[in-house]
Amino acid sequence: MPTTMTALLCWLVLGTTAVAWGDDVSLARCSDGTAERLRFVEDRLEERRPYANYWWMGWTGFYGIGTVVSSVQAGTEGDEGKRADYVVSAVKASFGVGRLVLFPPTAKAGAAAMGEVAPTDESACRERLRIGEELMRTNARETASRWSWKRHAAIVGINLAGGLIVAEGFDEPRGWRSMGIGIGVGEIMTFSHPWKAEDDLTEYEQKFGATTDYSARKISFEVAPLPGGLAFGMRF
């Protein structure tokens, strides 16, 4: 038994070392500075992936169930006012599903896009980093959009329109209640959106400096006239 345990511990240690070594080898052809940046970016993007996935699946499922339930209730309800309320609720829920399906949070994919560029040389490493930095900027913009007045105005506007249709068009007071619930749910969804990307980008820029365009520089040649001849120059 002790021999078995010793062998198991050795296997775990060697396995862990191999994983760490494999990570170093994968960036062995990158410069030290680029490799350090890559590790930071990839780690943060992957760290935010699980919550973004849970958030997306949770809200998509919530609105999907709401669409089905409200549609069934609308089809079986005999009262015209209540039926209108269910129809409006189904439409709003289906809108929520459509928005999430068409525009999922970028953080949901983690660093997957970076994996499409193998770090085979410094140029490829810089391209991989460029993609990662762009993902971080995109995630940060999506995080900041939680505070956009346009986003909150849209939540209020859509639910207000639904409330007016039901309450005024069908003389059904429950339309106002549905409006309030809809606004509340919309705000919870907005503020629970993956929110750490701004902090990640700020920390990255404080540690490494502002994000940079790592695309390869082009070499250009210049010719300028001089008295009695020409001057040649090269810019890179």
Q: Where in the sequence are the language-model features?
A:
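Long, highly hydrophobic alpha-helical transmembrane signal-anchor segments
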Residues: 63-96, 100, 167-170
